[in-house]
Structure formats: C-alpha cells, structure tokens
Amino acid sequence: GAACFCDSDGPSVSGNTLSGILWLAGCPSGWHNCKAHGPNIGWCCKK
C-alpha cells in the first residue's frame, strides 16, 4: 500500500513522516483504520 498520514504523525501532513499505509481491502492484523474513508479503503495505522 501507499503511505498515508496518521493522527500520531503530527498536526499537518507536510514535513512529517507518514507512518500509515493505505490498503485497498481493509487493514492487516495489528493495524487499525485511522480515517473513515469508505468501507473498502483503509487508512491503516499501527496500534
């Protein structure tokens, strides 16, 4: 998946490390969906 922005990464998207991963079929085990972005796309961040 592609990198995505997690709430824990900081207040803004620019200049911060993107620690999330964008998955197209939900999130893998040990991750959680940190943004509500539809039922099939998961903005997944480590728990």
Swiss-Prot record:
Known function: Binds specifically to voltage-gated sodium channels (Nav), thereby delaying their inactivation during signal transduction. Thus it strongly stimulates mammalian cardiac muscle contraction.
Biological-process GO terms, alphabetical: regulation of signal transduction
Organism: Anthopleura xanthogrammica (Giant green sea anemone)
Name by which UniProt lists this protein: Delta-actitoxin-Axm1d
Disulfide linkage: C4-C44, C6-C34, C27-C45
One cellular component (GO) term of this entry: extracellular region
One Pfam family hit: Toxin_4
Keyword Ligase listed: no
Domain of life: Eukaryota
Main location class: secreted
Single GO MF descriptor: toxin activity
UniProt entry keywords in alphabetical sequence: Cardiotoxin, Disulfide bond, Ion channel impairing toxin, Nematocyst, Neurotoxin, Secreted, Toxin, Voltage-gated sodium channel impairing toxin
Family of the protein in this entry: Belongs to the sea anemone sodium channel inhibitory toxin family. Type I subfamily.
Subcellular location: Secreted; Nematocyst
InterPro entries: Anenome_toxin, Myo_ane_neurotoxin_sf
